[in-house]
């Protein structure tokens, strides 16, 4: 391949940072970006061993990666991890904000502490990840935030705090896309539906009526019926869409939220 040849969807020469990528959807995103040729910064808060294992998997794909610890609830740590990423790889082209927490609770029972716990990571942290991404990214960069199909399209009882924390992301994306135009940076979000990760079995019972009466295997089978495609969603399904949004082919996709739930919502 000559220097002037463009390979569609490939990310050679790009540097990507994925927050909360020690496991689950974030890990799949980091691995996919590495598979597409990007150098990857694997950010983690507590999952050091899985993050370091993921770095090795990415390196085995023929690219480079590094694991950097940061609690992105703290803005100073967001700044530090992006500074360190730029110092290590010489630049930054793609920032994916994945870190988040789930929450269930009836409106009448939600505490101030629970509200703040959820919004501090799902909403506030994502805002400042985007701010620092804008400040650190090269021109023609990509910011990809994380919403949820429950933000607007899929209503779930006892889920108002989580849904609201993700709904704010959809407003952020539309306005941030305008703000980032001066650097030719696109801003988009993915909005997954139910996805089978290591957290799936802890939360699936809340999405399915009388879910607490069913086994983990039964819950997964029941969740598969929500999509007209009659299968579960997996982290790689989300990662493939992120890979597209990160690519040159997505340069005309901007300020958009892409729901990735197999048609469930």
From Swiss-Prot:
Keyword Repeat (UniProt): no
Keyword NAD carried by entry: no
InterPro entries with a match to the protein in the record: NAD(P)-bd_dom_sf, Sc_DH/Rdtase_CS, SDR_fam
Residue spans crossing the bilayer: none
UniProt pathway: Secondary metabolite biosynthesis
Similarity field: Belongs to the short-chain dehydrogenases/reductases (SDR) family.
Protein name (record): Short chain dehydrogenase mdpC
Gene: mdpC
């Amino acid at each position: 391949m000559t220097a002037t040849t463009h390979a569609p969807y490939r990310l050679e020469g790009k540097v990507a940072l994925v927050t909360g990528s020690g496991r689950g959807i974030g890990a799949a995103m980091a691995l996919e970006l590495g598979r597409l040729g990007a150098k990857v910064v694997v950010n983690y808060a507590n999952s050091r061993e899985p993050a370091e294992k993921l770095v090795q998997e990415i390196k085995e794909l023929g690219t480079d990666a590094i694991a950097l610890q940061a609690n992105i609830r703290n803005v100073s740590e967001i700044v530090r991890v992006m500074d360190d990423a730029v110092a290590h790889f010489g630049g930054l082209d793609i920032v994916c904000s994945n870190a988040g927490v789930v929450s269930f609770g009836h409106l009448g029972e939600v505490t101030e502490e629970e509200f703040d716990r959820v919004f501090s990571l799902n909403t506030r942290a994502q805002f400042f990840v985007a701010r620092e991404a804008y400040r650190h990214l090269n021109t023609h960069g990509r910011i990809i935030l994380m919403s949820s199909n429950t933000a607007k399209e899929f209503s779930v009882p006892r889920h108002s705090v989580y849904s609201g924390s993700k709904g704010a992301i959809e407003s952020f994306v539309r306005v941030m896309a305008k703000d980032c135009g001066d650097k030719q940076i696109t801003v988009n979000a993915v909005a997954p539906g139910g996805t089978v990760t290591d957290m799936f079995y802890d939360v699936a019972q809340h999405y399915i009526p009388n879910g607490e009466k069913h086994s983990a295997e039964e819950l997964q089978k029941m969740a598969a019926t929500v999509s007209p495609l009659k299968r579960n969603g997996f982290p790689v399904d989300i990662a493939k869409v992120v890979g597209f949004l990160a690519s040159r082919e997505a340069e005309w996709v901007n300020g958009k939220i892409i729901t990735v739930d197999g048609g469930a919502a």
